[in-house]
Amino acid sequence: MVAIKNILVPTDFSKFSDNALKQAVEMAKQNKAKVYLLHVIEVVQTCAVYYCLDQQTINTLDKNSIKSSEDMMQKQIKKVGSPKDIEIISYVKKGTPYEEILKEQEGKKINLIVMAAHGQTGLISHLLGSVADKVARHAKCPVLLVKGK
């Protein structure tokens, strides 16, 4: 078994993601591991049929989304509690969630991904597949899917 030293926790700020972060922090305590808390902002369509956003508006929206996400991650860390001996590194990426999660797994040498087992349901999930499903299928490390309580 590979030693767990780097744990990635993707978050969408739901109570389910809170549970995943709590689980990751407990595992980090046991293994003296780092926790990487990641939020991925999906790239939005900037043009509709008759209207496009200008670059300044897009840049402002991006900046505001990143700042808001960073603030929400700090609140999430405070909510679940962070032991002094566990390092939690939070950051935001922009892109397709499952793709960014998989890139981070490679780039940060992640040994374990802990994420909420929830998300899209019904027809959309059936047609597209959930983020958790895609990550579990394609990750090169173990993935722990945490169910809500």
Predicted regions and their residues:
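Structural beta-alpha unit
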Residues: 2, 75-113
